Design a protein with these regions (language model features):
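Glycine-rich phosphate-binding loop signature in dinucleotide/nucleotide-binding domains
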Residues: 6-8, 111-114, 165-171, 227-231
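N-terminal helical cap/lid subdomain that shapes the substrate entry/recognition surface
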Residues: 6-17, 21-104, 110-112
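Substrate-recognition element of Asp-dependent hydrolases with the DxDx(T/V) motif
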Residues: 32, 102-131
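Hydrophobic patch in the ABC ATPase nucleotide-binding domain
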Residues: 41, 136, 210
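Substrate-recognition "cap/lid" segment bordering the active-site pocket of phosphatases
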Residues: 95-97, 117, 123-174, 179-188, ...
Length: 234
């Protein structure tokens, strides 16, 4: 088999948001616990909640809700979660920060001619608020979220980015912190990079066969530069 070829046009980096670009672990964990408490249920705790981050909200909640919680109960939990998240987000002390080096990485990729997309389990409202609050609109050429189509790990959001930006799978990389991100990228036949500073562990990302797992923004940048030069992240 011949070695992979570098992209013939601008490469495309597709980023997850929560746990990849922004450290939202604390606020998401607290919001999920508050949602369960509002329904009189035992809070799941962060170690359970982290396993379902990235999925569309109702699908995620259904996975961790106690047996006996029906579809209406899941919908109520989702509404409680949204309300708790909005309330917590209004507290300046609860603002989820960009990870160190994330802004600089986006600036570097843009300067090198990359196109940048987003594939996130956030709602459209949540994604728009994130982009506005962090002043990131100048970086993203396309962005798709849970409101636009099927949940991760379905390939939809990656394929939508590809179609919107007229890119082929071999010209794109999916970057994310969960197995759902990696499987979504694999289902769309694009290269995948796992980052181990978010919700899923390095071992979990290796188990789902990410092309490479990185631990720092500089390692992520190096993998993306390799992709632009050689068509592979390793």
């Amino acid at each position: 088999m011949p070695p992979p070829s570098p992209p013939r046009s601008k490469p495309l980096a597709i980023f997850d948001v929560d746990g990849t670009l922004v450290d939202s672990r604390h606020i998401i964990g607290l919001s999920m616990d508050a949602a369960f408490k509002a329904e009189g249920l035992t809070p799941p705790g962060y170690e359970v909640t982290r396993t379902i981050v990235g999925l569309s909200l109702e699908i995620a909640i259904d996975r961790i809700a106690p047996r006996g919680v029906d579809a209406d109960g899941v919908k109520r939990l989702a509404e409680h979660y949204k309300n708790a998240y909005i309330e917590l987000r209004a507290d300046p002390a609860m603002q989820a920060p960009l990870y160190d080096g994330a802004l600089e990485l986006l600036e570097t990729l843009q300067a090198k001619g990359w196109q940048i997309g987003v594939a996130t389990g956030k709602s459209r409202r949540g994604l728009d608020i994130f982009i506005e609050q962090k002043n990131l609109s100048r970086f993203f050429s396309a962005h798709y979220c849970a409101d636009d189509g099927p949940s991760k790990p379905n390939a939809f959001m990656v394929e939508a980015n590809l179609a919107a930006l007229s890119r082929m799978p071999h010209e794109a990389v999916m970057i994310g912190d969960t197995s759902f991100d990696i499987h979504m990228g694999q289902n769309a036949d694009v290269a995948t990079i796992g980052v181990d500073w978010g919700f899923h562990t390095k071992a979990e990302l290796i188990k789902c066969k990410a092309d490479i797992v990185v631990s720092t923004m500089s390692d992520l940048e190096a993998a993306l530069i390799r992709f632009a030069d050689k068509g592979a992240v390793v």
